[in-house]
Amino acid sequence: MLFQNVSIAGLAHIDAPHTLTSKEINERLQPTYDRLGIKTDVLGDVAGIHARRLWDQDVQASDAATQAARKALIDANIGIEKIGLLINTSVSRDYLEPSTASIVSGNLGVSDHCMTFDVANACLAFINGMDIAARMLERGEIDYALVVDGETANLVYEKTLERMTSPDVTEEEFRNELAALTLGCGAAAMVMARSELVPDAPRYKGGVTRSATEWNKLCRGNLDRMVTDTRLLLIEGIKLAQKTFVAAKQVLGWAVEELDQFVIHQVSRPHTAAFVKSFGIDPAKVMTIFGEHGNIGPASVPIVLSKLKELGRLKKGDRIALLGIGSGLNCSMAEVVW
């Protein structure tokens, strides 16, 4: 869906404070590597992930999302009382219930007229949250919305490394869980608004979505374990992305050479290289953070956009493509005009 009256009033991210290097992980896994005859540095040399960030052990998803939300509200220069909708989009969550959104809302002190809920759709959820908020803004139901995401990977690292260093772990089990060691922690938040309220702010034009849910078994995760068919996930993910890109060209009028930045969901070096090659994108237009931050799930797209803003790499009028894909499989592509 395309929008005429939706803008991004504020944007912020939080980098988790602690760095865990792939070298440190490999040192712990070396006995297993030796026993299974694995000689390749899969995390560093193949995935291109040399480090990832972790929170303090007691930090929950709502804590991280709250930090990012406060920062985004400052960036937007508005008070929390103006927010009419708060959507949390994280894969990580504090509890099955209540919603993580309600905890973030309570932390922030939203007004009683503010609607709050979680949206879960693997790594695509933040863009889904933007679209839901944009629909309500476009119809005039609300003036401002806050989309948040806080990802925590500490527990999955602890439990995955316990299993992978077990003396009886098989090579199949080892490879199935290896992708869990590419995850990273981080948080992002975005304040969206009706355009007439923030006339000079970047515009969110909306976009398109396609799905291939017959592939819902390729990546399955819970709080402490993730099992992934990385090869097939890459193959089928690129196929779905190609279909989505065709739709984006038709609906948004995209021509690759006319877009100024491509904000791609950050998974790994092979995934990014496949995206760039498949669509003929100039690599100079693709900022990557997976090398030092890992895969931060649905937070990765807004974090990259926020970092581009922070670094001064976005100028008025730039056309920015948001390319998101999530396990399931679901894919969305959208445009922001800065």
UniProtKB/Swiss-Prot annotation:
Gene3D superfamilies: 3.40.47.10
SUPFAM superfamilies: Thiolase-like
Effect on the protein upon substituting H265D: Hydrolyzes 91% of the substrate after incubation for 24 hours. Cannot form the beta-keto acid product
Entry GO MF terms: 3-oxoacyl-[acyl-carrier-protein] synthase activity; metal ion binding
Assigned GO CC terms: cytoplasm
Source organism superkingdom: Bacteria
Site keyed Important for activity: positions: H265
Protein task: Involved in olefin biosynthesis. Catalyzes a non-decarboxylative head-to-head Claisen condensation of two acyl-CoA molecules, generating an (R)-2-alkyl-3-oxoalkanoate. Is active with fatty acyl-CoA substrates that ranged from C(8) to C(16) in length, and is the most active with palmitoyl-CoA and myristoyl-CoA.
Membership in a protein family: Belongs to the thiolase-like superfamily. OleA family.
Activity control mechanisms: Inhibited by cerulenin.
Pfam families assigned: ACP_syn_III, ACP_syn_III_C
Keywords: Acyltransferase, Cytoplasm, Manganese, Metal-binding, Transferase
Subunit structure and binding partners: Homodimer. Weakly associates with the OleBCD complex.
Catalyzed reactions: a 1,2-saturated acyl-CoA + an acyl-CoA + H2O = an (R)-2-alkyl-3-oxoalkanoate + 2 CoA + H(+)
Residues binding Mn(2+), per UniProt: H18, D56
Active site, UniProt feature: E97, C123
E.C. number(s) listed in UniProt: 2.3.3.20
Paired cysteines (S-S): none
Domain notes: Contains three extended channels that together form a T-shaped, three-channel nexus. Contains an active site base originating from the second monomer of the dimer.
Name assigned to this protein: Acyl-CoA:acyl-CoA alkyltransferase
Any GO BP annotation: fatty acid biosynthetic process
